[in-house]
Each structure stands twice: as C-alpha cells, then as structure tokens.
C-alpha cells in the first residue's frame, strides 16, 4: 500500500472512532512553485540559493538542471561538481557505508538509485545550517552552464523561501477532515484541538514552527509513524529527522484520551487564540477586515466579525452533536433558500449573563454559527428562526433544553438596497415615514399655539375688515391721547385745597358726570 493509501486508511479509522483530525497542508518540496521566489521553480541552468541559517528537508520528485547552489550568507558559490554522501533510508537493504557519489559532469545526472535516498553534502553544505535532499525514484540534478536556457538570464538565481514561515498556529495551514461546502470551523478550531489527531503527509518533507506554550493533541502522525505517548514523541523530536521538521520554543505533547461525550468536547484552544489570530491576520497587517453588515457578530473562537446569525443551545444527556449536525445539513441547509449559507457547530464555553448567578446553568453550550457568504442578507436570520421553531417542536426528542438566537443587521454601503427590497423592510420603511410626518405636524401645531399665546403670531379677519366703511379709521379712540377738532377740551378742575395730594388727574370717562353734578 502506498503513502496516499495509508493516509486514507488512517483517516477512515479516525472517522470510525469519532475522532477528528487536522491534516497539515504546506510542504517543502523542491518541485513546488510556491516554495520559490517569483512563484516558480528554478528554470534550467539557474543558480539555486537556500537560506544559510535554516534547517530544512527538501523532497525532490523530478530531475532538474541547475548551474550552482549557493548559501545566502556566503557569496562564494559551491559548484554542483562536488562529492555528495547518499545514505539509503530503505531499511530493507541498507548499505554497509554511506554511498560516495562521484563528481557530476555537465549534462549528467547525479547518481540516483531505484531506492529513495537522502543526499547530504560531504564537506560544505549546499543546503543551509543542516538540511537534506530527499530524492524520489527517478529524481536528480544535472549540471548545466549558466545562460544555456533562454528563460534564465546570466547571474539569475532562484531563492528557496524561508522554511520557518510555516507556523502550527496558522489556521490557513490546516485542513479539516469534515470540511465541506456548507461546513466550516471557527478560527480557533481550525488548528488541531485537544482531542484531534494531527496528521502530516507520509514520506514528505515539511517544516512546522511550534509557537509559545505547549501544544497538546490526541496523537501525531508523521513519516509513517503514529505517536500516542509523550516518550515516543519526544524521542522523535530529538532525532535529526524530527529537528528538520519541527522547530521553535514551544512543546508538543500527546494524550491518547479521545472525546467520549456524544455532545462533543470543548476545543481547548482558548489560551492560544491570540497567537492563532495573530498568525491569521498577519497578511492583513494584524487588523480584521470590515464586515459587510451592521451589528456584525463575533462567535466564540472567531478572530473577526461576520454577518449571519448565531444559535446557542443548552442540551441534556440525550443530545448528540453529530446527529444534530447531520439533521441541519439535510433538513435545512440543503434547501434552495439556504444555499448561500455555511454552518459551524461545536461545543464552546458558556458565558453567563449578567442577571444569572454563577453556576446557575451549565458552563458549556452548543454554538451554531450561520455565516452569510453572498451579497444578499437575511437568509441566516430566517434559518435561525426556523431552527428555533424546530426546537420548540422537536427539542425534547433531540435533547435540546433551550435555544436563543442572535442575528446581524442590514448591509452597509451600497449593498443596503438589497435589504430594502424585502417586504418586511418596505413595510418598516413606510411605517417610519408615516410616524415621522405625524410627529412633524404635531410639533408645528404646538409651536403655533405657543406663539399665538405669546402674542408673537396674529392673523386678521378679512371678512370684518371688508365690512368696515372706507373712511372709518382703524383702531379705537384712546380718550387719554385722542383729541377731536369739533369737541372742546373740558375745563381743568380746580384743585381741592383740603386735599393733601399735590398732583392728580381726572378720568375723562367720568369727568363730565362729576362736572354736571357739581353744577
């Protein structure tokens, strides 16, 4: 059975035992274009450079024609016409002593046997500080003069990128076994969790940087070996093969205990989530991109906000996580109206609410994240409400005790018009406009009444003004200041000597009556 078959068998066994696994994706292949500068493999006749202060194992699958191999920090070129030690790694027929390769001539392949072999430089490393070529069957190098190929200019060199750039805590470098079109994992769970199996491709070259702290997983599979005990794993990491593939200040340990709870187990990456988010956001300058919706949500274990909905479930002993996930996939996400959604489901620590006493409820819950991937919004909220209705009807049979839902707001920017096309959005808009108009009319009416009462606002009666004669003067006759030409002013009254007042006036309205009485 070949290496791909063994990996497939291992993954099937993991699935049968309900154990999740994460598969390491990047490699350090010589033939992989993304391991070289300018995203292309060395062309024929090119000079090849490796970082001088790094350790790496490089798998070579094909034949290559190159001119020189150089160290970055040593400008003296090491010509490919050098002696190489080639030690066979096939234990079935190991050689008595390291095989001595003769100097290669121009145009001639370095000796490559039918067995896979690891080539190490005899005196000065062509590779950096400590490294190796792993030559597959039929692979090798041939020497060719610089510039003999049209694609290679004189003095052009191909740079092998830093192999230490691959970090364990980078979620982009792992592939989950249960990943699908409608499924995803929150960022903290994209890295191997406490009860996961970390699987590295067999018979392949790779390089993994262990970050700070201790990484603990259920098992580690590398180079065709499965490590479930710390003693065996520590011996491998201390070996030359282990040092070439694992580096860093962190520690790696295993615990073969599997997750036996049908409702799932907490991932256990909460402590290393800051490093996970730092590695994930490093290409973006350490900042999250702006979400495409208002009131975006950030699920437990996610580094950045997203648009969609979150359904939180509390469960009883009858709840089965895998069975409920399958139910949602087939009964809901398979429907046409939910095709643009992706779902993540896992057990997470439960954050108690402010009005709850500590320890009043379970300390874990099931988090169902419904993420919207398309420009249209609202489908995640509709699915969340459908799940609540389904739980209200079948919750007891499913083992769900209670459920709550949260959903993000409408889109931001130019995409907000899409949300206004929904019937509910249009009715809300019309209701808001009517309420605003009524409020405006009420404010105007109150302002007019206040101004009228204060005397700052008057209006004339046009029908009364029209009925008055043309010659009638406007206003009223003030007897104090008004004097008519045809009426003589009344005589001034004589002051009463008995009065102690020194100044007084007579009211013109009553002055005539008093004068007649005195007469």
UniProtKB/Swiss-Prot annotation:
One Pfam family, short name: Amnionless
Gene Ontology cellular component terms for the protein in this record: apical plasma membrane; clathrin-coated pit; endocytic vesicle; endosome membrane
A single GO BP: protein localization
Keyword Secreted: no
Chain positions covered by the region annotation Interaction with CUBN: 67-143
Residues carrying a glycan: 35, 39
Residues annotated as transmembrane: 431-451
Ranges per topology, Cytoplasmic: 452-519
Domain called VWFC: residue spans: 256-308
Tissue expression pattern: Detected in kidney cortex (at protein level).
PTM (free text): N-glycosylated. A soluble form arises by proteolytic removal of the membrane anchor.
Segments on the Extracellular face: 20-430
Domains (record comment): The complex formed by AMN and CUBN is composed of a 400 Angstrom long stem and a globular crown region. The stem region is probably formed by AMN and the CUBN N-terminal region, including the EGF-like domains. The crown is probably formed by the CUBN CUB domains.
PANTHER family referenced in this protein's UniProt entry, alphabetically: AMNIONLESS, PROTEIN AMNIONLESS
Function, as annotated: Membrane-bound component of the endocytic receptor formed by AMN and CUBN. Required for normal CUBN glycosylation and trafficking to the cell surface. The complex formed by AMN and CUBN is required for efficient absorption of vitamin B12. Required for normal CUBN-mediated protein transport in the kidney.
Protein name listed in UniProt: Protein amnionless
Source organism (scientific name): Sus scrofa (Pig)
């Amino acid at each position: 059975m070949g290496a791909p078959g063994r990996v497939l068998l291992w993954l099937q066994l993991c699935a049968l035992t309900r154990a999740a696994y994460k598969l390491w994706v990047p490699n350090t292949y010589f033939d992989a274009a993304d391991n070289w500068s300018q995203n292309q493999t060395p062309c024929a006749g090119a000079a090849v450079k490796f970082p001088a202060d790094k350790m790496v194992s490089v798998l070579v699958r094909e034949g290559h024609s190159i001119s020189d191999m150089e160290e970055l920090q040593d400008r003296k070129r090491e010509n490919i016409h050098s002696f190489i030690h080639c030690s066979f790694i096939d234990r079935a027929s190991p050689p008595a002593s390291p095989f001595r390769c003769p100097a290669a001539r121009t145009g001639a392949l370095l000796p490559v046997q039918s067995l896979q072999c690891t080539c190490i430089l005899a005196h000065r490393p062509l590779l950096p500080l400590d490294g190796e070529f792993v030559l597959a069957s039929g692979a090798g190098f041939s020497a060719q003069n610089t510039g003999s190929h049209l694609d290679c200019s004189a003095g052009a060199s191909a740079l092998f990128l830093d192999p230490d750039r691959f970090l364990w805590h980078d979620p982009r470098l792992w592939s989950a076994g249960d990943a699908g079109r409608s499924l995803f994992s929150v960022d903290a769970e994209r890295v191997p969790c406490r009860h996961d199996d970390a699987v590295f491709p067999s018979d392949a070259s790779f390089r993994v940087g262990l970050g700070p702290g201790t990484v603990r997983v259920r098992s580690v599979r590398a180079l065709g070996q499965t490590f479930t005990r710390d003693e065996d794993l520590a011996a491998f990491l201390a070996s030359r093969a282990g040092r070439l593939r694992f580096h860093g200040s962190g520690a790696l340990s295993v615990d073969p205990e599997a997750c036996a709870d049908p409702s799932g187990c907490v991932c256990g990456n909460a402590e290393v989530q800051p490093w996970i988010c730092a590695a994930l956001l490093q290409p973006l300058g350490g900042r999250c991109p702006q979400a495409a919706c208002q009131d975006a949500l950030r699920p437990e274990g996610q580094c950045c906000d997203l648009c969609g909905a979150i359904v939180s479930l509390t469960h009883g002993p009858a709840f089965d996580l895998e069975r409920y996930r399958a139910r949602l996939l087939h009964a809901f996400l398979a429907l046409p109206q939910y095709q643009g959604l992706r779902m993540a489901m896992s057990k997470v620590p439960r954050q108690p609410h402010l009005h709850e006493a500590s320890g009043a409820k379970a300390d874990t819950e099931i988090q169902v994240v419904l993420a919207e991937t398309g420009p249209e919004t609202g489908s995640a909220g509709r699915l969340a409400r459908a799940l609540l209705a389904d739980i209200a009807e079948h919750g007891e049979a499913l083992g769900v005790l209670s459920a709550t839902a949260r959903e993000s707001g409408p889109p931001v920017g130019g995409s907000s018009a899409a949300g206004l096309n929904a019937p509910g959005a249009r009715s809300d808009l019309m209701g808001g406009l009517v309420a605003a108009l009524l409020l405006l009319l009420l404010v105007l009416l109150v302002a007019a009444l206040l101004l009228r009462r204060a005397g700052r606002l008057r209006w004339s009666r046009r029908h009364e003004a029209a009925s008055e004669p043309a010659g009638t003067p406007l206003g009223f006759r003030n007897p104090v200041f008004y004097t008519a030409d045809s009426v003589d002013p009344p005589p001034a009254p004589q002051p009463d000597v008995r009065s102690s007042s020194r100044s007084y006036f007579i009211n013109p309205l009553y002055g005539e009556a008093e004068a007649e009485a005195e007469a």
